[in-house]
Amino acid sequence: MVESLLSGIVLGMIPITLAGLFVTAYLQYRRGDQLKI
C-alpha cells in the first residue's frame, strides 16, 4: 500500500514539474524578447 502511495505521489509530481519547467522557459523567452526590443 505504501508503494501505491509513492507511485501516486510521483505520478502527481511529474505534470507539476513539467508545467513549472514550461512556465519558467516561457518567462525567460518573454524576458529575452523584451530585452531585444
Swiss-Prot record:
Keyword Signal included in the entry's annotation: no
Cell compartments where the protein resides: Plastid, Chloroplast thylakoid membrane
Transmembrane stretches, start-end: 5-25
Main location: plastid
Lipid bilayer topology: Single-pass membrane protein
An annotated Gene Ontology molecular function: electron transporter, transferring electrons within cytochrome b6/f complex of photosystem II activity
Xref: InterPro entries: Cyt_6/f_cplx_su5, Cyt_6/f_cplx_su5_sf
A single Gene Ontology CC term: cytochrome b6f complex
GO biological process, one term: cytochrome complex assembly
Keywords: Chloroplast, Electron transport, Membrane, Photosynthesis, Plastid, Thylakoid, Transmembrane, Transmembrane helix, Transport
UniProt keyword annotation of Transmembrane present: yes
Domain of life: Eukaryota
Assembly notes: The 4 large subunits of the cytochrome b6-f complex are cytochrome b6, subunit IV (17 kDa polypeptide, PetD), cytochrome f and the Rieske protein, while the 4 small subunits are PetG, PetL, PetM and PetN. The complex functions as a dimer.
Function: Component of the cytochrome b6-f complex, which mediates electron transfer between photosystem II (PSII) and photosystem I (PSI), cyclic electron flow around PSI, and state transitions. PetG is required for either the stability or assembly of the cytochrome b6-f complex.
The family this protein is said to belong to: Belongs to the PetG family.
HAMAP family tied to this protein: Cytb6_f_PetG
NCBIfam families: PRK00665.1
Identification of the protein by name: Cytochrome b6-f complex subunit 5
Organism, as annotated: Mesostigma viride
Gene it is expressed from: petG
